[in-house]
């Protein structure tokens, strides 16, 4: 076991702070409409250019182990915010850094970290409650386009594309982003279905960068029981191999033991391009969803209830689809080869069930099934001139899409960091002592995103924050793109309420953990010995060189 180094109290927190500062300094330059790009060296290929906070944070590893721990914790804030809300990673990082900085100052001066943490949590809770009150529901295509435009770094074309995609498949529909083949961005709506079950083994992955299994022009086997014995599965696998080894997706209650191990081995050897996932849903709902997939893909559910065994399955029982994408959590089936009339009949049947049911839960689940069958999948194909530009643009479209979904979920608030300031100004907590100090830390740090946006645009952050706070109209904020104070809703500068909420909650969570840290334990980095000098023994003949 390697030797460890232990640091205590102010020294420990000081080193953690240095790490947090270094990460925040690299991330915060990307913030706002006039934020700058960050160039990231890759271990192979050309460097990547990004203005996405989480992409920058993910690349940062610091040589000092204690500083690196601080940086990694704040990196987690950015990643978690991106996972939950799809955007707001830079906001979360800037907030975490400023809360930690303000808190550290007070704790060094003698405040009790635990009491300070309590005050911080109470203030954050109160701000979140105010954000929910001022959030405005997203009603039309124009508002959706505004949110998407802001999240795509003020690219109105991407905003329009996402708004159009949402209009076509509905807010419950599935929208995926792919790399296009041309210079133009394109929108394609494909009949398809997505359900929340991912691959049973990462060895099924075909695209290691995205960690996805992509099956083109594939067969689909649907079985309503567990598969653990390989001999039951063998006859149908042999038939698939005889067709020219088309890819196969197996959907069953579960696949385990010998069956799963054999499938993985055959996949790795290249004998069979296969992927296995669990069937979606539970109980009767699982049977209904398997039947939905069967109708959509033109297959049959192999079920002992109708006298069919897995051994008796034929190629005619298998469904077919143009493209199947399976990641860790979801399976998307695009271009199912099912009969259109049968799909329409199934949709009518589900609609009738929705009208008849009295249970809200059942109604919600039926509507989900309806969206999967009727909504289809919208595919946004991103176009660009170079691979570097393509990656950067695709990241922006992914961000914008996630932010738009968040906006539809919890509504929108005025953007540019203004909503947090407005919500904080309405908070009135009756606290005392160190708890009050904790609350004040949050209320001061909450202005950091607004100030950072102003600073990146070349304006005095203090003056801008003061002008926004003292504005008569509650919707007045700072438009960093033009340098004007405007009605943010009218100007279309909006943020999803969920993004602001999640960014604040995650930032407070990590900053309070850092502030209550009293010791750090880290490995001592040993300097690697220099490589030995090459042996010069073979040069003995040079002795006769007299000068």
Swiss-Prot record:
GO terms for molecular function: ATP binding; ATP-dependent protein folding chaperone; isomerase activity; unfolded protein binding. Keywords: ATP-binding, Chaperone, Cytoplasm, Isomerase, Nucleotide-binding. Residues 528-547 are annotated as: Disordered. Coiled coil: none annotated. One of its GO terms (biological process) is protein refolding. ATP binds at residues 30-33, 51, 87-91, 416, 479-481, 495. It catalyses: ATP + H2O + a folded polypeptide = ADP + phosphate + an unfolded polypeptide. Its EC number is 5.6.1.7. GO terms for cellular component: cytoplasm. Residues 537-547 have a biased composition (Gly residues). It comes from the Bacteria. CDD domains: GroEL (cd03344). It is found in: Cytoplasm. Belongs to the chaperonin (HSP60) family. Forms a cylinder of 14 subunits composed of two heptameric rings stacked back-to-back. Interacts with the co-chaperonin GroES. This is Chaperonin GroEL.
